[in-house]
């Protein structure tokens, strides 16, 4: 996190994978189950009032992929960590449900 913070303060864009199981975070609903979810995006939003630009990869044939970049999701600094985290999980659920066969998890998110 320190490295992300250092780079962000220098004006770099940073990326986080929010679909990973974490040992620290908060429990937030993910496909109707409680799952520990990172609060790092919420912390950056609340501290720096930054935008979240959702990005994901989608297969378009057997060997090629497209990188999909969506419109920024904006939150106010006053939005709670819980709401930001839940809203990002909702976005992730919707994205997964578009093409569930393309989502790869090598871990149990709900453990």
Predicted regions and their residues:
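Non-catalytic C-terminal accessory region of glycerolipid acyltransferases
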Residues: 2-111
């Amino acid at each position: 996190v320190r490295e992300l913070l250092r780079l962000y303060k220098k004006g770099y864009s940073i990326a986080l994978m929010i679909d990973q199981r974490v040992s620290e975070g908060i429990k937030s609903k993910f496909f109707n189950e409680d799952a520990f979810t990172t609060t790092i995006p919420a912390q950056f939003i609340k501290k720096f009032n930054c935008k979240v630009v959702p990005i994901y990869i989608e297969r378009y044939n057997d060997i090629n992929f497209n990188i999909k970049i969506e419109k920024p999701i904006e939150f106010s600094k006053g939005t709670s960590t819980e709401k930001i985290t839940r809203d990002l999980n909702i976005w992730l659920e919707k994205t997964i449900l578009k093409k569930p066969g393309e989502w790869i998890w090598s871990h149990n998110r709900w453990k």
